[in-house]
């Protein structure tokens, strides 16, 4: 026969007391006990993408996957997140498995290359072990792994060129993510995995595209971003950048399937000012009449390029537009909860 209500409550309290004694206070809690603070985020560098993500940026303490075709802007998006984390006083690390990180380009995007921790590992096991140790230190704010496809298992590197190694990389990723996910949440570190596209053979219906490294990353990711180049930006006959579309194909912290478009300028990265102009027009703060852009009765310029230059020369106007957009849409970028003032998170036990 089922226990009476008072007996059940007493049994539960005894069990909770024993759990707290064995595993520490807070191991089990009622969901409504504490009002949870808003999710802390790291801005992406594009107001359009911050809005599409629904919370104002990439969530802290979560796994993020950025994938897309070659030269679509995946690493650029990741480096902008690194720059924004560093600007707020955070510590960043970059696992360069592709051995292709350009320090000069990273510096142009605002990354403090002197403070950036960089590793160029020899094997996938080494890369993920380094990443795991950095995360468990509790001192890291953002970690980028570029890319999953370049995380080659040790057995494949040491074997012959024609050897078959079925499922090795998928098993490696699955084991690593099982270990990392809890540590990421405890330390508040954002882990960005950059991934490449492959095509499945013999697919008759639906998209043949898939990402490397098995299915584990798809499951463990809180946010998945599909980055595509949709247009080449030209100044006369010279190509000066790309128009990029990012689709939020998975989002555990806000409604998914939203899209953002922004400009990536060669040698400069994401055009923050261009993104502000696009969102300002969309939200009604900037008026577009013909080719002229006007804000609050003041002409920004004729044509988007002139308006962009005006905002570059008058950053206060750009900041004001950004503030109004965020207030209207109810998003804000709480980055690192005042990293400089607060104590760093406690290291995670190995």
Swiss-Prot record:
Domain of life (superkingdom): Bacteria
Family indicated by similarity: Belongs to the RecA family.
Cited SMART domains: AAA (SM00382)
One GO MF term attached to the UniProt entry: ATP hydrolysis activity
PROSITE patterns to which the protein is assigned, alphabetical: RECA_1 (PS00321), RECA_2 (PS50162), RECA_3 (PS50163)
UniProt keyword list: ATP-binding, Cytoplasm, DNA damage, DNA recombination, DNA repair, DNA-binding, Nucleotide-binding, SOS response
InterPro entries: AAA+_ATPase, DNA_recomb/repair_RecA, DNA_recomb/repair_RecA_CS, P-loop_NTPase, RecA-like_C, RecA-like_N, RecA_ATP-bd, RecA_C_sf
Gene3D superfamilies reported in the protein's UniProt record: P-loop containing nucleotide triphosphate hydrolases
Keyword match Ion transport: no
GO CC annotation, single: cytosol
GO biological process, one term: SOS response
Subcellular location(s) per record: Cytoplasm
Residues bound to ATP: 68-75
Official protein name in the record: Protein RecA
